[in-house]
Amino acid sequence: MKKMKSKIYLPIEVKRRELYSRIYFSIKASIQGYSVTIGRKSRFHEFEKKIQPGNYISKSAGTQNFDHIKRLKKAGHKIFFIDEEGLMSFNKEFTHRRFSEEGLQLMDVIFTWGNNHKNELIELYPSLKEKLKIVGNPRVDILKDISKQFYAEEIKKIKNYYGDFFLLVTKFGKINFVKRKNIIDYYTSHLTKGYLNTEKLKEICKRSIKHEEKNFVNFINFIKLFNASLENKKL
């Protein structure tokens, strides 16, 4: 029997965004001899005293997560950090507003999406340079040609049901979201969480909301134009 190299813990924050890619990663890691555990981030917090020391891939480096990370390190875990939202950046201060140098210093290794992501973090936090490793993200790996078989059955079912169609992927989370008890609006939510701690960040946040509002109007207009111009096509 092949001896397991070590344990890897993969907390999941947003199921639809992360689950398939984490399953894919787990299969690859298991083949290499690792024992992998996938679960909700909140459940890892709940059972942190029961999991054996291993490689914990953290999703959060904010102040609210400091104590959790410190307890894991004290228990013998090696802490890695992956930022699910680090791929797209129009302003490095705004993109990385959700965590601080203090939080990132708690990490043993910080995974980055690529050179741009790594260089931005070096510019913001020069002391972290040796911790940064370019690894990409399994969410991209499962989209590559070699991995499309991962979705083969699901693709077949969708095509059989809908036929040929154009898939228009959108993201209007700043203005078109479901209101919850703890989320009134995008700006207030970020302000309350302490992410907008400078006037510059507040202004960028307001501008990004305005930008999305304009794009949302353009999106609606595009749908109308598409339907009028290509009546026989599905969107």
Where are the model-predicted features located?
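Generic start-of-chain signal for non-secretory N-termini
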Residues: 1-10, 215-222
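Active-site and donor-binding regions of nucleotide-sugar-utilizing enzymes
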Residues: 3-156, 168-177
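Conserved catalytic-core segment of nucleotide-activated headgroup transferases in glycan assembly
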Residues: 148-235
